């Protein structure tokens, strides 16, 4: 059994898929309720820099990545936070979760990206009532804002990006932020202004006013941060873009102390090998001299880690697997695909 910690692109596509290709059984653990990692934060953004993949929204790439990552039916555990990794002996590791579950494996791949990432929550009384309706921390689809009056709280690049894209289809877009000026790119500020986005500096959300059954936000009380002046405005949807809380305590608190780079990334030794044999790191969490932080690089890292894990678990195994076009495991699936394209 190979243990993969993290369900983002690196952990999914190659630490899971490629390990299956190499005839390894895989257990994948992720702290989130859904697979995808950081890619779920920007589902509508267009991804251009994956070789051989035409530019398309991130959520479409993620859908294919998850499908491929689950091809060999890995054992998937969601909503489980790993708190410790222990090497008991060669090819004998224990991974413990916050709930006290202990999983054993012969090798471990760490693919946790920048750690646990969650959007910073709006600090307003009763906010939790609206999180399943019209209060959003991530924009899943621009279409839902068509002909709507939309409020965005935040002055960074993400807030301005959303304002720019949503303004093209919404009835109105208002952006509030605490500072005198937005912190996002000046060029983007000009673009949103040209789209008649209303920018409200030194303004914050003070209260959310619900509808009769308190399931949807109907109005927002806005407050000037200096004067304290307040006014109430009707909005159909409210989007919060206050940044993210990041947690990466696993690497600092684990029993298996790995060599680190700048105290925040695992030090890789020219590849995905770490300072502890049998533990590998891939994706954004690993650093080495040739590292580039791209989705495409995460895929490559995952394949490298899976190959190294294979030869660690089975020393007489080939260093690399067969290319997929000639792999026996896809023989029947290839027939279906060929017939689909020929007839």
Curated annotation (Swiss-Prot):
Domain of life: Bacteria
Keyword NADP part of the UniProt annotation: yes
Keywords: FAD, Flavoprotein, NADP, Oxidoreductase
UniProt cofactor(s): FAD
Catalysed transformations (reactions): 2 reduced [2Fe-2S]-[ferredoxin] + NADP(+) + H(+) = 2 oxidized [2Fe-2S]-[ferredoxin] + NADPH
Binding residues annotated for FAD, in chain numbering: 10, 30, 38, 42, 82, 117, 284, 325
Cofactor, free-text remark: Binds 1 FAD per subunit.
A GO MF label: NADP binding
Enzyme Commission identifier(s): 1.18.1.2
Record text on subunit structure and interactions: Homodimer.
HAMAP family: FENR2
Family statement drawn from the similarity comment of this UniProt entry: Belongs to the ferredoxin--NADP reductase type 2 family.
Protein name in the entry: Ferredoxin--NADP reductase
Lineage, uppermost ranks: Bacteria, Bacillati, Bacillota, Bacilli, Bacillales
């Amino acid at each position: 059994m190979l243990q993969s910690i993290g369900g983002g692109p690196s952990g999914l596509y190659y630490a899971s898929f490629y390990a299956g290709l190499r005839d390894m059984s895989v257990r994948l653990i992720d702290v989130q309720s859904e697979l995808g990692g950081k890619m779920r934060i920007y589902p509508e953004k267009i991804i251009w820099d994956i070789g051989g993949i035409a530019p398309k929204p991130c959520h479409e790439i993620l859908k294919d990545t998850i499908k491929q990552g689950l091809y060999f039916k890995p054992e998937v555990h969601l909503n489980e936070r790993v708190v410790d990794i222990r090497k008991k002996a060669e090819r004998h590791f224990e991974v413990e979760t916050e709930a006290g579950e202990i999983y054993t494996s012969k090798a471990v791949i760490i693919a946790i990206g920048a750690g646990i990432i969650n959007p910073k929550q709006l600090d307003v009384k009763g906010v939790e009532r609206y999180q399943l309706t019209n209060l959003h921390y991530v924009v899943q689809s621009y279409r839902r804002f068509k002909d709507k009056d939309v409020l965005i709280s935040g002055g960074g690049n993400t807030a301005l990006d959303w304002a720019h894209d949503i303004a093209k289809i919404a009835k109105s877009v208002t952006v509030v932020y605490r500072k005198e000026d937005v912190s996002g790119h000046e060029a983007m500020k000009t673009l949103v202004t040209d789209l008649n986005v209303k920018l409200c500096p030194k303004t914050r959300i003070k209260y959310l006013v619900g509808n009769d059954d308190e399931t949807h936000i109907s109005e927002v009380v806005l407050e000037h941060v200096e004067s304290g002046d307040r006014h109430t405005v009707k909005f159909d949807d409210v989007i919060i873009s206050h940044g993210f809380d990041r947690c990466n305590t696993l690497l600092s608190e684990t029993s298996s102390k790995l060599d680190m780079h700048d105290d925040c990334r695992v030090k890789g030794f020219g590849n995905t090998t770490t300072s502890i044999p049998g533990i590998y790191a891939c994706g954004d969490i690993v650093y080495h001299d040739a590292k580039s932080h791209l989705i495409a690089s995460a895929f490559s890292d995952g394949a490298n880690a899976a190959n190294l894990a294979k030869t660690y678990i089975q020393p007489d195994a080939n260093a690399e697997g067969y290319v997929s076009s000639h792999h026996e495991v896809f023989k029947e699936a290839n027939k279906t695909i060929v017939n689909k394209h020929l007839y």
